[in-house]
Amino acid sequence: IDLTLDYWTINYKNRIEVESAQVILNNNPNGASITRNQFGELIAVSTSYFNEERTEVEGLDIALNIFKSTQYGDFSYSIKATELSEFLTPEDTDGDERSIMVNRVGKFNYDANTHSLPKLRLNSFLSWTINNLTFGINSRYLDGYSNERSIPSSATSLGYTNQIKSFLVHDFSITKSFQLR
């Protein structure tokens, strides 16, 4: 049995980040970076890179590995998880020369130059090897997150919400080992 627990923190200064096309559209839907056809339909958004003044990230990694060899074959199980507790990025406030740090964890982040950041990601792997056969089950869990963008009443009347639900995926596999001559 092998168990590891790692707390980590990363503080970036002037991290190179790519602009989000959605943020550019939100800030100025008809700006110079936006290309539209003669009907006003969106064709392209030109993005570039910039230095984000700072980014602060904090989390916890957990891993458990178990291996057991028996007369019925070899069994192995592992589980690996990452909990993201902070992903702080600057957000400029109107008229303020200083930016405030906003925690992006658990959010869709349509308004930031980053992506959706679920709080928890978990992967587990179970395998049984006997003779030249390996049977495996892999499972992946991804935490849900919220979208803080408002949703029109026409969408909410159809049951849509601002929550992206968590999901769990299972993969099953069978592998046969053989030697080529």
Each language-model region and where it sits:
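Short, solvent-exposed micro-motifs at the edges of structured domains
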Residues: L64, L84-L88, T93-Y110, N162-Q163
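Conserved C-terminal beta-signal and adjacent last beta-strands/turns
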Residues: L60, N65, G73-T82, D111-R181
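Outer-membrane beta-barrel translocator domains and adjoining extracellular loop/strand segments
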Residues: R15-Q22, L88-R98, S146-T156
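Feature marks short, surface-exposed loop/turn motifs that line or immediately flank catalytic pockets
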Residues: N11, S85-F87, D143-Y145
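Outer membrane beta-barrel strand-and-loop segments of large Gram-negative receptors
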Residues: T4-S76
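A glycine-rich, aromatic-flanked flexible loop/lid motif
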Residues: S33-F39, A81, D94-R98, N138-Y141
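Extracytoplasmic loops and strand-loop junctions of Gram-negative outer membrane beta-barrel proteins
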Residues: A32, G40-F50, S99-A112, S116-P118, ...
